[in-house]
A protein has these predicted regions:
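GG-anchored amphipathic helix commonly corresponding to the ABC/SMC/Rad50 NBD signature/C-loop
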Residues: 441-458, 488-502
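Alpha-helical coupling/stalk and coiled-coil linker elements that connect catalytic or binding modules
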Residues: 2-432, 440-441, 451-469
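Switch/coupling sub-region of P-loop NTPases
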Residues: 469-503
């Protein structure tokens, strides 16, 4: 078992005065404030998590916090993973906490990961061929997901059938089309019905060949309309108008106008919902097309990598589900006010409901969000490789760790003094306060972790015999708790020793 601790890890004295403290300020990724942001990539499994548990080792919270892997004490500075991955969208940003969970001693996996990174040039070219250039809109997708999956009033809001016994009719475009037409036509019917009642007496009298006079017409009209507001209004208005009759007349007219208002409001809501559904489905269609292309490019280049078999199998499975969604959404076009779009309302509602209710599609979409974040992270690593900010490591089970010209990640855009480290014996580092002792230790620990996750780090070269345990003794807070600082330091040392002994 190999174990490395932040307290004693160096083989020779390094000049700590040559290390500069980071002063960079991160470029913030814009996040929409209109819609609550959900972490859609939280349960995504990185390729490293497909390895056998015996080859996986967790990064403790102490180590993560001390090395500032995810968060920093200064909110204006980037975390260490941000310097490595350079996330450009929210999916990539939200996936970063998943990286800090594990590192591995599986050298075959690390070499396969290096091959994946080396294939990124071809991956990027394949993705951009045929002018395929989709700009992913994470905020829009988050908004769509909230509406599809987090809306408790989904069925009632979009006028779907809510009765469980016949809820399956929501998957019938024909039935949904009929319901939509009826809902859209109801305001017109309510408005036209009074005028039709005015015409019907003429038709009846003409059919019965009865001479048409105004008195006869009114009698027939009152008989026909006795259950409608017109008949009631005529019956009320033809007599003497008392106060109670006037109030009653106003009431029934007001009720009729309210009915028209409600119908028009419902019709307007349906129209706006149709525009929204069409917009959401078209966005999902474009995203799914992009995601399928993304997965196919990765599989084409990396399906033969042995340590990536499990990951590639999952990609293939979810890609098949996305193709089914793509087939369903192929008919969806940008919204335009036309008769053709009116006849498509049932189909749009069917597609929308299918995505809302299909559990397999939900899992595949969530996988695609995580996969997008993963590929964006890899592109950030590859960009660092192209710029020669980082280099690949070599692995040797017979020797000690030897890192040449390593430096602290936050100094990547500066001109740092680089240092060599050879871990064949313990050493003691000494320097004045703020001389860079902690920076050297953190640089070494970070590069070991990065190398055992991705096979590369912030150095010119590295030969590494993978470590199984990584401990940190960098930051022991002096709090007002029951432990003194000395007791807290002793307790941390005891925890590290116990872990080593148990292993």
């Amino acid at each position: 078992m190999l174990s490395v601790s932040c307290v004693n890890i160096f083989s020779k004295i390094i000049n700590p005065d040559s290390i500069k403290e980071p002063t960079d300020t991160p470029k913030e990724i814009p996040i929409s404030t209109d819609t609550p942001t959900i972490n859609l990539v939280q349960n995504f499994k990185l390729p490293i998590q497909y390895l056998d548990n015996s080859q996986l080792f967790s990064i403790t919270d102490n180590v993560s916090n001390d090395l500032e892997l995810i968060t920093t004490e200064n909110e204006k500075q980037k975390s260490m993973y941000h310097h490595l991955f350079k996330p450009t969208n929210n999916f990539a940003e939200n996936l970063i906490p998943e990286w800090k969970k594990y590192y591995t001693t599986n050298i075959d996996y690390l070499n396969d990961t290096k091959n994946v990174l080396e294939n990124m040039t071809e991956y990027r070219n394949n993705l951009l061929q045929d002018n395929f250039n989709y700009n992913i809109k994470c905020e829009k997708i988050n908004e769509i997901w909230n509406e599809l999956k987090m809306n408790d009033d989904f069925l009632s809001k979009y006028n779907y059938i809510e009765w469980d016994m016949i809820k399956h009719f929501n998957k019938s475009s024909d039935i949904l089309q009929v319901i939509s037409i009826m809902n859209l036509a109801s305001p017109m019917i309510s408005f036209v019905m009074p005028f039709m009642l005015l015409i019907i007496p003429f038709v009846i009298l003409k059919f019965q060949k009865i001479p048409i006079t105004f008195t006869v017409y009114l009698d027939v009209l009152k008989e026909i309309g006795k259950n409608h507001f017109i008949g009631k209004a005529l019956a009320t208005g033809m007599g003497s108008l008392t106060a109670d009759k006037v109030i009653y007349l106003i009431f029934i007219i007001g009720f009729y106008l309210l009915q028209i208002y409600q119908n028009v409001t419902m019709c307007s809501r349906m129209y706006n919902n149709t525009i929204k559904i069409n917009d959401y489905l078209f966005e999902m269609r474009e995203y799914i097309e992009y995601s399928i292309k993304n997965m196919e490019c990765f599989l084409k280049l990396n399906k033969e990598l042995k340590c990536y078999n499990g990951f590639c199998n999952d990609i293939s499975k979810h890609c098949d589900e996305l193709r089914k969604m793509q087939l369903l959404l192929n008919r969806v076009k940008p919204f335009e006010l036309s008769f053709e779009k009116l006849l498509d309302m049932g189909y749009l509602l069917k597609c929308y409901y299918e995505i809302h209710s299909n559990v397999d599609w939900e899992q595949s979409l969530k996988f695609s969000f995580g996969f997008e974040g993963y590929m964006n992270n890899l592109l950030g690593v590859f960009e660092n490789l192209e710029c020669k900010n980082i280099s690949y490591a070599n692995f040797d089970l017979s020797g000690n760790c030897h890192i040449e010209k390593q430096y602290y990640p936050p100094l990547v855009d500066e001109n740092p003094v680089k240092n060599d480290c050879k871990f064949d014996k313990n050493i003691i580092i000494s320097s004045p306060n703020a001389g860079g002792k902690t920076t050297i230790i953190k640089s070494s620990m970070l590069n070991i972790i990065f190398s055992q996750q991705l096979g590369c780090g912030f150095y010119k070269s590295c030969v590494l015999n993978p470590y199984t345990h990584i401990h940190s003794y960098l930051n022991i807070p002096d709090t007002s708790g029951r432990d003194s600082l000395f007791q807290a330091e002793s307790r941390r040392c005891k925890e590290i020793i116990d872990i080593i002994n148990e292993s």
